[in-house]
Amino acid sequence: YWGMRVVYVALAAGAVFAVYINGVAEGWWPAWGERPTVAATTTPPINPAPTASATASGEAAMSGGYQIGPDGVLVRPAEHAASTYTKPQLPEEAKENTERGAELAAEYLLDTLTYAWNTGDTQLFEDITESGDNFRETYIHNVNELYSHGWMYDNSSTLTRIVSVEPVTDPKWNAQPNTIGVVFNVVTSNGTSCVNKRIITSNEFNVSVIFFMTWKDGRWVATRGEVLHDAQE
């Protein structure tokens, strides 16, 4: 598998998504499914801005069925609060220095990333990834950037196939000693997210995920990560 030819390698899905949400926040382009407004129109907006009388009466400002918070960001629905998500737990077998242990640690890593997107809490993801790795730092930045003016729920990553779990020994990969390469096929979705006052929904898409899991200091840590689109073996 490590000799595969990649037809097109995309940036990590979170990096692409972060560019998009930043563009929405800055007004560079409309959100998915949102038609650009026409400057001169006699048609009233579907969701007009709250009137002075409404806000003065103490009623909360609303947009698209969502309450607008004091920071100008739509309020996250209580039924999808970050507190409704359970922290993933590292399986005991993932603590063993075996190929199976590396595989389970990689699955747990996927779970920590999903948890980070849904809650804004990147600590578990940080703990199992090596500081300085581009994959790690990009995702931490993107999650923090989103939660600085928004939120996300129903983000998901479903493992559909374990493609490969094997030692990485070829020098061309510049892997650290004691590294196991783990390759998954995954169906993923960004779920529903909010950027300021805009709601963004995502469809599912297929990716291949590669983790270099390295046994260091008595545990598995991801020393490299990659998300591939339209890859061909």
Question: Could you say what each language-model-derived stretch is?
Answer:
Residues 1, 13, 59, 78, ...:
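Short linear sequence motifs
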Residues 2-9, 16-42, 166-233:
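Exposed beta-sheet edge and beta->alpha loop/turn motif
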Residues 9-10, 14-104, 108:
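Juxtamembrane and targeting peptides
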Residues 23-26, 126-129, 133, 145, ...:
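Solvent-exposed, non-transmembrane amphipathic alpha-helical segments
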Residues 70-154:
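Core segments of small alpha/beta cavity-forming domains
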